[in-house]
Each structure stands twice: as C-alpha cells, then as structure tokens.
A protein has these predicted regions:
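Short conserved micro-motifs at the rims of enzyme active sites and ligand-binding pockets
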Residues: 31-33, 85-87, 139-142
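Glycine-rich beta-alpha junction loops
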Residues: 24-27, 79, 133-135
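Catalytic-core signal marking the mid-to-C-terminal active-site face
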Residues: 96, 101, 105-212
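Generic structural "secondary-structure junction" signal
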Residues: 2-3, 10, 22, 34, ...
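Structural beta-strand/beta-sheet cores of well-ordered domains, especially the beta-sheet scaffolds
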Residues: 4-6, 16-18, 43-44, 71-73, ...
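Secondary-shell segments that build the walls of catalytic and ion/ligand-binding clefts
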Residues: 40-106
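Phosphate/diphosphate-binding glycine-rich loops and adjacent basic-rich segments that engage nucleotide
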Residues: 1-65
Length: 212
C-alpha cells in the first residue's frame, strides 16, 4: 500500500477553509526527504524494516524504501496496540475506491514496471466526492456552523504548556500569509541541490539570489 492520502475541504465563515490533507501512513516520503536534507534522523517507530525493526537513518530509509526493504508504518503506529489497523484499513479503502471504480491499477502494479522490469506508464485512479451544501441547510448556514465548530475547538481547554489550539488548515494559512509577502525560505541543503543541478546543466552564467 502507498500513503493513500485522505483529503477533506470544507468552506467556513472564516478567512480560510477547513482543509485536512493527511496520508494514511504515519509519515510520508516528503517528510523523510526533509529530515535527510537537514541531517536529522527520522523518529523511531515511523518506518519499519523487513525484519520488523524500526529505522531512523533518514538517508538510508529513502534508499531502503526505493528497494522495497522498508515500509512506512500505518497511521496509528505499528501493531494493534497502537491501532495501526485503523490506518491500514483507511489505506485499503482508498486503494479499493481508487481502483475498483475506474479500472485503476493497485498494489504492486503501482511500481511503474511490468513483470520484466520495464518501465511503464502509471494508470493511477483517484476518487472524489463533491457535496452541494446548498441542497441541505444552505451554503451560508453550513459555513456558519463549520466556523462555530472551529472556533469552539480553538477556545477549548489547552494542554499544559500550550498557548494555542489549531484546526486543520490554519497553520498552512498562516504560513501562506507570511510567505506571500516575505518569500519562501530555502534551506542550505536545498541551496546546494539547486547549485549542483545548475552546474550539472552547464548554466553557471546564472546566479541564485542566495549566492554571494
């Protein structure tokens, strides 16, 4: 199974919608790639090896996943004790709905290679549901109720040491508001990747803004 994300978007009466976009695995490749770029280990328990051990070396994890020597743990964690069966079940639901409704490929066929190891095009299925809120209580009533729920959640009792409660999509909205004016930060590791790619393509006459 892949990360098989579940994504929900709902309008509210606030400046931003409720937006939940999450993998059915406990972590996704992009996060591990980020850890590798900044030289950090991946927290234990998020990636499992074939022998059942957990892996933490971010660079090695990426290699092992590509060679099918490692897998991402399901949402909830490893084993029944931490309810990993829930993430496994959610991932299976996405797999079925994305394949069975439109003859999409699934499981091992998603490797992008045929039985002889030859690269072939992906035929990935997707599954969408759109709900016309106007057909129920009306779009404005929906937005108001959704907004009230989010505000009540944010105003609920906070955990010790926490000064704020977020709802899904709120952090991303805050980041977008900041970066649309201030720009997107580029880590030193990514800068090196950009420079290496430019040099490899023979475009050394061009300079990046972060180069001195």
């Amino acid at each position: 199974l892949g990360t098989n994300p579940l994504t929900f978007g709902m309008p509210t009466d606030e400046p931003f919608p409720f937006m939940l976009d999450c993998a059915t695995s406990i972590i996704q490749n992009g996060k591990i790639e980020y850890y590798a770029r900044i030289g950090h280990d991946t927290p234990a328990g998020l990636v499992i090896a074939r022998d059942g051990s957990t892996l933490t070396d971010s660079v090695q994890i990426l290699k092992d996943i590509r060679s099918q020597k490692a897998a991402l743990a399901p949402l909830g964690g490893l084993g029944e004790l931490f309810a990993g069966y829930k993430g496994y079940g959610y991932a299976t639901v996405v797999e079925i709905l994305s394949a069975a409704l439109q003859s999409g490929i699934y499981l091992k066929d998603l490797e992008g290679k045929d039985e002889n190891g030859k690269i072939r095009p992906y035929h990935i299925g997707h599954f969408f549901i759109a709900i016309d809120t106007e057909a129920f209580m009306g779009s404005e009533a929906f937005k108001k109720t959704a907004g009230n729920i989010l505000r009540e959640l944010r105003n609920s009792q906070k955990a010790p040491g926490q000064d704020r409660i977020y709802t899904a999509g709120e952090k991303e909205y805050d980041v977008w508001m900041f970066r649309k004016d201030k720009g997107v930060p580029v880590t030193e590791a990514v800068q090196k990747e950009f420079i290496g790619l430019r040099d490899e393509l023979g475009l050394t006459q061009f300079k990046f803004p972060f180069e001195k």
